[in-house]
Curated annotation (Swiss-Prot):
Cellular location(s): Cell membrane
Keyword Cell membrane among UniProt keywords: yes
Name of the protein this chain belongs to: Uncharacterized protein YqhR
Source superkingdom: Bacteria
Keyword tags: Cell membrane, Membrane, Transmembrane, Transmembrane helix
Spans traversing the lipid bilayer: 29-49, 76-96, 105-125, 139-159
One annotated Gene Ontology cellular component of this protein: plasma membrane
Membrane-topology descriptor: Multi-pass membrane protein
Keyword field contains Secreted: no
Pfam families attached to this UniProt entry: YqhR (PF11085)
């Protein structure tokens, strides 16, 4: 019985070693997409419970015609589209801030993204009022969601980057990491 367990463990170890590791770019893209989908879904829930006046499908407003964009299909497409756009934001974080190991750069990154969306890109979205016209509930809710998005993406990318570097260092020094 013991030999079959050992054989199974050895086979699992061989399979893990034979699998090609996921590239850092793949990890960044996955983190960005998942972060965008997760936090835009949270934003949609906040919209449903009237914590925010802004729904994720605001992203479709200037580019797509029809009323369908304000309903279920429009919301799903918007959440996925935000996930795709978020891949670019994740790569931007990776290029600029990946070496920083604390949570604060991610939180500040989320704040910068909020400022960009609500001050710089606001004129693109005709259905979104200016920040001075939004309710305080909307402002606070959206800031919190952007801060959490920045924390999620930033800390995940920094962790993966530093973990990958420590694995490379351990291999270079001939040490085995678990």
């Amino acid at each position: 019985m013991m030999t079959s367990e050992k054989d199974t463990e050895q086979n699992e170890e061989l399979n893990e070693k034979q699998k090609p590791p996921v590239s850092m770019a793949g990890r960044v893209a996955a983190t960005g997409f998942c972060g965008g989908v997760l936090w835009s879904f949270v934003a949609y829930i906040a919209y449903l419970f009237h914590f925010s006046e802004i729904s994720p499908n605001m992203i479709l407003q200037p580019f797509v015609l029809g009323e369908w964009k304000k309903h279920g299909l429009g919301t799903v497409i918007s959440i996925i589209l935000i996930g795709v756009i978020s891949i670019g934001a994740a790569f931007l974080y990776f290029l600029l801030l990946k070496r920083l190991k604390t949570m604060w750069p991610g939180i500040l990154y989320g704040l910068v993204l909020w400022l960009l969306v609500f001050f710089v890109f606001n004129p693109i979205f005709p259905d979104v009022r200016t920040v001075t016209e939004l309710t305080s509930d909307t402002i606070i809710t959206t800031i919190c969601i952007y801060l959490l998005y920045g924390l999620f993406v930033g800390y995940s990318i920094s962790f993966e980057y530093n973990e990958l570097n420590s694995e490379k260092l351990a291999r270079a020094l001939g040490m085995h990491r678990e």
